[in-house]
Amino acid sequence: VSGGQGSEAAAGAAGQGAAGDKISSVLFLCGMNAIRSPMAEALARTMLPATVYIASAGVRQGRRDPFVDAVLAERGLTLGERQPQRYEDLEDGYFDLIVTMAPEAHHVALDAAGTSSVEVEFWPMPDPSVVTGSREQILDAYRDVLKRIETRISGRFGR
């Protein structure tokens, strides 16, 4: 299990795990599966091959965030009818790679990974829901996080 910011270098070629094996499933995990991890899931579905299974979850139950829908719609993306889900409620709990976006999610993923061969990477992302101001200022914070996630996915998977 890898768990630091240096884990990207250890991952080797884009789309491969540390051992060089192809990654076939990715879970994006954050606090409530309301903002960062659903954004990552929506982006990854367009940036990674269709053969890669992509999911997202939170360590706690969250509510769908309308600002996420707004910034995704600006990019022509949608979550459809998808609602936030908890990590412990996932039907298939095995993933080749778990990308965590909040410290609490990282600790949960490391504990869950235990001695298994799953890779865990921490991609710290700011929480745009703490930003105050006008609607446009708040949307800018969400856009910034979306762009950061897109950059990380592109860098990690070479897309």
Predicted regions and their residues:
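Structured loop/turn residues at beta-strand edges in well-structured enzyme cores
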Residues: 21, 93, 118
